[in-house]
Amino acid sequence: MSGFLSGDPRPFRSVRPFAAFLVLAAPFCVSHTALAQTSATDDPTEHLDVPGRRPLDRPAPVGSRLGLSLRDTPATVDTISRDTALQRGALSAEAAADMLPGITSGGSPGNPGQFVLRGFTANEITVLHDGTYLGPVTMVNRPQNSFNLQDIEVLQGPASVLYGQGAVGGVVDERSRDPVLGRRSADLLASYGSFDTWNAGIGVNQPISRDAAVLVDVSRSSSNGYVPGSDPASLDVTGALLWHAPHRVTLRLGLDVLRDQLSSYYGTPLVPAASASFFGGIAGGLLSSGTGLAIARDSLWQNYNVRDFTTTSTSLRPTLRLDWRATDRLTIHEKAYFFYAARRWQNAESYSFIPPGTDAMDAEGNAIATGSIARDRFHVFQNQHQVGDTLDATLDGSLFGLSNRVVAGIDGSYLRFIRDRGFPDAPYADAVSLSDPDRGEYGAFAGDLPSRKSPTDLGDLALFAEDVLSLTRTLKLVTGFRYDWLWLGRDNFNQDGSFNARTSFSGTYHPNNGRVGLVWNATRDITLYGSWTSADDPPGANIFLANRGQFDRLSHAQQAEIGLKAALPDGRADLTLSAYHIERNRMLVATGPDTVSTAGSQHSNGIETQANWRPAAHWTVSANAAWTRARYGSFHPDAATDATGNRPPDVPALVGNLWIVRDHVAGTPVDLGGGWRHVGDRAGDYADTLSLKAYDTVDLFAAYHLRPAVTLYGRIGNLLDRHYVQWADVSYPTEVILGAPRSFSLSLQASF
């Protein structure tokens, strides 16, 4: 397959000399900089981020515009820094977020970068980039390299009061790095590992005056993939210019450019258990099925997609942020942005096993042999243009003689999304062998072209306000409100170009949401809180895929949460604990073969906790766990399926992480660390007839400090080589996504 950056048959292969250069050059570069700074880095932990440590007094931007600390935010906010992610070997934002309480991630190439939070998933989760919403996660999200990020912040639970429609289960904010004034620095990363996986990155922070600095981060990745021939690759360039202008004005101009190619691995097909014996037997420990389905051993790590697959995207996002401290009590903030993305998929996505006694034909009218894997063809081309602006003011003052801070503002955006798609007239395009697939080419099939076009326009204008009132020295009342004027228009065109009035529609919606929270600092180190918050989101359909009758009104969710945040006085340990209940109503349900209504519901209860502890010098321990009980109320995802009382797909009841790190073992420049992760059983479909087995993975790393700021890492991922199902995409009911097997990597990281 031709690379989309060059004619190289392996995209991004040029990352290899780039990475090799970093490996060879970094020690020499640092020998003249880091060595000269030895006196400033004698503390052995100076260059080492403390895994999982979350000082409760630092701000939590994703949780509020009020500038509240983690301690004073009446919600659960979790953060993982770039340094922690890279130390643990998490090179993507999804892998890093998985280390936070209660979060799992997954998705197929058609719906990449999905998250599960508090019993909700897919478009019920809002993913932000530097605080900006770019569309439903299943349509617009792409894996992000963690090298380019400052941190990942997660707000658990409904958050429409802050970010508008869609934020029911929570918000994941992937935040880019900011320039630092007055300090010249550079960061290097070079990594090679199993499956011919390369990662490389370079970041430079350069002051250009006393009041201005520029930062540029560039990262590249390339891999054959743990499923051979899946070939994921990416190039991510992020940069920012920071200027402290006169008159107490700060300007930040940012740019994010991404070109990527997603993995071509759409899944491993399910087969009748009785047929698996002809293909190496059943691969045990992966799933159980009430309808007699299993995974055949011969299908493990097979790629059934076409060789000339397409899963590429190019995106561009410039941003401008202005902060003006007009007076000692009044600050004005403005953020403007533009976003463009072009995405292309052209693949064989669905794989169906043809059991004995079945008559099936391909698109050419040929009989498909039983025991084969029948494939479809599907192409989707997307173009997205979006502009937006947020303007708000923060005022510090008093209310009824009590200390008070209020934020009020306006948020506006316009999004134009054009989706072209096509597929053959026949149910199956062709077929391949289960155990030794000849992947073939995409080809041409009757009915695939011309494309069916569906442009969508989404406009949003919102008024919002937040307030924190200090009722006493230890008691704070935190409130918020947001009113949206949301306009959605979707035009569908038939293959012949004629307008489809039956499915096209337009509508106006007026969601309004709020938050009320009470925060009590019981002692200097112990805080208790309780809160209520709400959210609105599309009732069942993707906002870019909704047709007439599927979007008459928004669904509505409410959450009640209580929690505790505490730390030891000496700062050696901190703990957060929360319990919540979420109700979501007005979900889209099928009431007949061609009729729907918004009568569905879902509820979720859970407990989450995170603890970080330094039991002794050179030791750090980070642990978290989350228990979730999520169930549908009345819910019929289609006319033939009654999911009432069932678990939502891909939602585990229990998720846990444990990381232990020992730095400078026995006084040597060697660090050792290990992590354990548990993910519980999950439903694999709406009917809850497919159950994905629980799994545990163990990761290990050893680090050798060549210089105070140069570290060589060796890692083993999935040490016990546990085979497991990571994800079941309900859009592809005949297949599941397997998780990565055991892997090894060697990397060099340097900062100077």
Question: Which residue stretches match the model-derived regions?
Answer:
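Face-selective signature of the C-terminal outer-membrane beta-barrel domain
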Residues: 318-340, 373-493, 576
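Gram-negative outer-membrane beta-barrel transporters
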Residues: 474, 581-583, 598-686, 720, ...
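Short acidic/polar hinge/loop motifs at secondary-structure boundaries
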Residues: 105, 116, 132-156, 175, ...
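Structural signature of Gram-negative outer-membrane beta-barrels, strongest in the C-terminal barrel
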Residues: 244-246, 384, 403-407, 411-415, ...
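C-terminal beta-signal and adjacent terminal beta-strands/loops
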Residues: 4, 677-685, 703-752
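Membrane-embedded beta-barrel scaffold of Gram-negative outer-membrane proteins
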Residues: 323-325, 329-337, 341-349, 521, ...
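Acidic/polar loop-and-plug regions of large Gram-negative outer-membrane beta-barrel proteins
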Residues: 221, 225, 238-244, 248-323, ...
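Outer-membrane beta-barrel translocator/receptor signature
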Residues: 147-150, 156, 161-239, 245-249, ...
